[in-house]
């Protein structure tokens, strides 16, 4: 059985998802963690997970970069054939859920850790990003089998 954790930052995978990674491994899964670079990979691998580098511009708004990220995730999912994919934070949730659905992953989990700048700021830029993100979230969450809200108040948005 194979589980892929789609992470926007290596540090958050280790610091905030380390116990989850260990628990999933203890349940008999092979765990693969994606991240944007090789910084801190040894900590992730020390947990027993395998690491795959997939660059992501976490705060960028370039659709070409985002589609490139989604394509790289899709290719990874087709190659590794995971049983479960879990993405957390906006871009891993959006592009990971869509790619996992297209790749035929049986179980897709989206973890909304917080709404962030696009949904909390009131600038023109934030409002424009919010409009696009709302459409993308709707599509992505329709691809997910399970959606986890770390902050239940975010569910209303």
What function would you assign to each model-found segment?
Residues 8-13, 57-61, 103-127, 145-146:
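A short, histidine- and acid-enriched strand-loop-helix "catalytic/donor-clamping" loop
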Residues 9, 37, 89-91, 151-153:
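Helix N-cap/beta->alpha junction signal
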Residues 39-42, 142-157:
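A short, active-site helix/loop in glycosyltransferases that binds the activated sugar's phosphate group
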Residues 76-83:
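Glycine-rich phosphate-binding loop signature in dinucleotide/nucleotide-binding domains
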Residues 22-27, 71-74, 128-146:
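Membrane-proximal helix-turn-helix segments that form the acceptor-binding/catalytic region
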Residues 63-75:
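Glycine-rich, highly charged phosphate/nucleotide-binding loops
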Residues 87-93, 112:
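Short His-centered aromatic/hydrophobic patch
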Residues 2-64, 157:
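N-terminal strand-loop element at the rim of the active site
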